[in-house]
A protein has these predicted regions:
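A conserved beta-strand element that flanks and buttresses the S-adenosyl-L-methionine
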Residues: 95-96
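Conserved S-adenosyl-L-methionine
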Residues: 163-173
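Conserved alpha-helix/loop element of class I SAM-dependent methyltransferases that forms part
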Residues: 11-31
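A C-terminal cap/extension of S-adenosyl-L-methionine-dependent methyltransferases
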Residues: 175-235
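Short, glycine-/aromatic-enriched active-site segment of Class I SAM-dependent methyltransferases
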Residues: 125-147, 153-156
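Class I SAM-dependent methyltransferase SAM/SAH-binding core
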Residues: 33-35, 39-83, 110
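A short glycine-rich, Lys/Arg-flanked "PGG" loop and its adjoining helix->strand segment in the class I
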Residues: 109-124
Length: 235
């Protein structure tokens, strides 16, 4: 997974997308502390370390070791999202990517409420999860995905936690038709997208993702293969 995070087109594109959506809202002070929640190897959140000390919390020790090796600005903490032991108002930002969907997290709304608790007033909380309930595929089974979210559901969870939503959008909309088709073709088979087609059809998918990011600078989409919410804890 660590190697895929460096080379796979989706991880590269996702880092750029998250930067675009989250960076403008980060606290501009040197002592700001950030959290990459369930950050794994840092494949999607390592860029946060450029903005100050960043705690990466994950249950997998090997992933944490890889993250700290690749991003020395990380402070590794072993734990899971269902038992966040951080003090109230600890972080200037909280990032959580493709983790609320996991089977090991039975109550994602409760986790988002915890994010709101540990976020300081004015802090940004960014959530990115698999989108499209009808787009279930064998990749979801292999990666222990327990649920997919609509943009509306992710928005409702953030608002239910008392957060003010800044941006709510779908992403990777151009992947919806092929994902639907692959779901039919792969039915009953155990296959994952990790390590598959790392170049993104020779750069084509990366180029489409770049075009979509330009669109998302000004607009939002109601659907996509991913659902994203960027919110803020009220002052």
């Amino acid at each position: 997974m660590a190697a895929a995070g460096e080379t796979h087109w989706w991880y590269r594109s996702t880092r750029e997308l998250l930067r675009q959506l989250v960076e403008p809202h980060l606290a501009a002070r040197p002592n700001a502390l950030h959290l990459d929640a369930a950050g794994g190897t840092g494949a999607t959140g390592g860029w946060l370390t450029e903005h100050g000390p960043t705690v990466i919390a994950d249950f997998d020790q090997f992933s944490l070791q890889a993250a700290v090796h690749d991003f020395p600005g990380y402070l590794a903490v072993r734990g899971d999202l269902n038992h966040l032991s951080f003090a109230d108002e600890s972080f200037a930002s909280v990032l959580c990517v493709t983790a609320l969907c996991h089977r090991m997290n039975p109550d994602p709304a409760a986790i988002v409420r915890e994010f709101a608790r540990i976020a300081e007033p004015g802090a940004v909380v960014a959530l990115m999860e698999p989108g499209g309930k009808r787009l279930w595929r064998s990749h979801d089974d292999v990666t222990h995905t327990g649920r997919r979210f609509s943009v509306g559901e992710l928005t409702a969870m953030a608002q239910g936690a008392g957060l003010e939503v800044i941006k709510a959008t779908g992403a990777y909309s151009f992947l919806v038709p092929p994902a639907w088709l692959m779901g039919i073709i792969e039915r009953g088979k155990a296959k994952s997208d990790v390590g598959r087609n790392e170049s993104g059809l020779g750069g084509v998918l990366g180029a489409l993702a770049s075009l979509e990011r330009r669109f998302l600078r000004r607009f939002s989409m109601p659907f996509g293969l991913s659902a994203i919410v960027v919110a803020r804890r009220p002052l």
